[in-house]
From Swiss-Prot:
Identification of the protein by name: Elongation factor Tu
Superkingdom, taxonomy of origin: Bacteria
Catalysed reaction equations from the record: GTP + H2O = GDP + phosphate + H(+)
Residue stretches making up the tr-type G domain: 10-207
Magnesium keyword on record: yes
Lineage: Bacteria, Bacillati, Bacillota, Bacilli, Lactobacillales
Gene Ontology CC entries for this record: cytosol
Compartmental location: Cytoplasm
Record-listed E.C. numbers: 3.6.5.3
Length: 398
C-alpha cells in the first residue's frame, strides 16, 4: 500500500504527558488515541492500546538510551505528535537532552494521590527546559467520592505550579478518568474531547523554525579563489538569503560582521537556504582564517558568545557507556556544542558533594573560550571523545 502523504494543511504541534509514576500517563495517551478514533475517525486517528504504548522502543539520543512512545492523532483543528515515556528516568533524559521537544504538556495527577515527588520534578524540569504551557488532567476521579477532596487536590496542584512560576491560578484543570474513557463510558469520553479542545485552545501554535532568527553552526570552511570564503553546515533555524548581513559568533571574544554573497546546496545556487538545509554560504569580507568550525553564523544581535552559564544535566550510567565513578566540584570535561568541544569547569550546587552516574543535577559551567549559547541550547559532556553526560543551558551568567 502506498504511504499516505503527510498532510500539512493542519498546524502541527508537539505535546506529551508528564507526571508521577502510575498516575495514568500512558492510560491517558491510550484514551486520547482511542476516543479520537471513535469520535473523529480518520487515517491518522488510530486507537493505540496501553500495551503498545508501554512497550516503547529504545532510542539512542546523543549516546543515551531512552524509551519513548511516539503516537500521532488529529483534532478538527490540528495534527499532534504526542510523546509518552514509561519510566521516570526516561522522562528526565527526554527533557534534558531535548530529545522530546514539547510545545506543551499534559500534567497527569491521580486524584487519589494528589501531587507526588515526580509531579514536582516534572514541573521543575518543564520550567527549566522551556515547556511553557501545561494543562492539568486530574485522573481517576471515579475512585474519589468526596467532592471536597477533589477541590483540595486541585488547589494543591495549582499551588505547586505557581511555586515554579507557572500560572497556577489560571491554567486549565480537567477532571476525568482515562480508564473509564478507554472502556467506552461516554461521560468520560466527553471529558477526553473536552481535554483535547482545551489543548487546541490553550497550547499556542509554535513558531516555525524558518520564522526564527538565522542560526547556522559552521562545520567546515574553505576558500574559493577569486570568490572568497565559504562556510558550510546545516541551518539550525531561520533562513539565509543572498545580501543578508550576518554575524559570526563564538570561539573569539569579538563578534564579526559579514555579508552573504551566495548560498549553495548540492553545488546549485539557491535564492535562500531554510532551516534543515545543508548549505555552503559565501561570505564577503571574511578571510579563510577568520572563521572556524564551532562558530555560528547568525542574524545580527540574535545570539551572543558566553563563557558562563547554568545547565541542567543528566550523567550517563556505566551501562550507558558513561563514567564508572562519581565526579566532584571543579571537574573539567569537554562540552560539545553543535560542532565542537570546549573545555569547561563544573561547579556543583551548595551541599552537593559529588555527582553519581545516573544522576541529574543543576551545574554552573565556565568555558575556557566563549561559545554562542542561549537558554535552551543543548550540549553533551565528553571525556576523551566519549559522551558521559547531556544537558541544556537554563540560564546565561556571563
Amino acid at each position: 500500500m502506498a504511504k499516505e502523504k503527510y498532510d500539512r494543511s493542519k498546524p502541527h504541534v508537539n505535546i506529551g504527558t508528564i507526571g508521577h509514576v502510575d498516575h495514568g500517563k500512558t492510560t491517558l495517551t491510550a484514551a486520547i488515541t482511542t476516543v479520537l478514533a471513535r469520535r473523529l475517525p480518520s487515517a491518522v486517528n488510530q486507537p493505540k492500546d496501553y500495551a503498545s504504548i508501554d512497550a516503547a522502543p529504545e532510542e539512542r539520543e546523543r549516546g543515551i538510551t531512552i524509551n519513548t512512545a511516539h503516537v500521532e492523532y488529529e483534532t478538527e483543528k490540528r495534527h499532534y505528535a504526542h510523546i509518552d515515556a514509561p519510566g521516570h528516568a526516561d522522562y528526565v533524559k527526554n527533557m534534558i537532552t531535548g530529545a522530546a521537544q514539547m510545545d506543551g504538556a499534559i500534567l497527569v495527577v491521580a486524584s487519589t494521590d494528589g501531587p507526588m515527588p515526580q509531579t514536582r520534578e516534572h514541573i521543575l524540569l518543564s520550567r527549566q527546559v522551556g515547556v511553557k504551557h501545561l494543562i492539568v488532567f486530574m485522573n481517576k476521579i471515579d475512585l474519589v467520592d468526596d467532592e471536597e477532596l477533589l477541590e483540595l487536590v486541585e488547589m494543591e496542584i495549582r499551588d505547586l505550579l505557581s511555586e515554579y512560576d507557572f500560572p497556577g491560578d489560571d491554567l486549565p484543570v480537567i477532571q476525568g478518568s482515562a480508564l473509564k474513557a478507554l472502556e467506552g463510558d461516554s461521560k468520560y469520553e466527553d471529558i477526553i474531547m473536552e481535554l483535547m479542545n482545551t489543548v487546541d485552545e490553550y497550547i499556542p501554535e509554535p513558531e516555525r523554525d524558518t520564522e526564527k532568527p538565522l542560526l547556522l553552526p559552521v562545520e567546515d570552511v574553505f576558500s574559493i579563489t577569486g570568490r572568497g570564503t565559504v562556510a558550510s553546515g546545516r541551518i539550525d533555524r531561520g533562513t539565509v538569503r543572498v545580501n543578508d548581513e550576518i554575524e559570526i559568533v563564538g570561539i573569539k571574544e569579538e563578534t564579526q560582521k559579514a555579508v552573504v554573497t551566495g548560498v549553495e546546496m548540492f553545488r546549485k545556487q539557491l535564492d535562500e537556504g531554510l532551516a534543515g538545509d545543508n548549505v555552503g554560504v559565501l561570505l564577503r569580507g571574511v578571510q579563510r582564517d577568520e572563521i572556524e568550525r564551532g562558530q555560528v553564523i547568525a542574524k545580527p544581535g540574535s545570539i551572543n558568545p558566553h563563557t558562563k552559564f547554568k545547565g541542567e544535566v543528566y550523567i550517563l550510567t556505566k551501562e550507558e557507556g558513561g563514567r564508572h565513578t562519581p565526579f566532584f566540584n571543579n571537574y573539567r570535561p569537554q562540552f560539545y556544542f553543535r560542532t565542537t568541544d570546549v573545555t569547561g569547569s563544573i561547579e556543583l550546587p551548595a551541599g552537593t558533594e559529588m555527582v553519581m552516574p545516573g544522576d541529574n543535577v543543576t551545574i554552573d559551567v565556565e568555558l575556557i573560550h566563549p561559545i554562542a549559547v542561549e537558554q535552551g541550547t543543548t550540549f553533551s559532556i565528553r571525556e576523551g571523545g566519549r559522551t558521559v553526560g547531556s544537558g541544556m543551558v537554563t540560564e546565561i551568567e556571563a
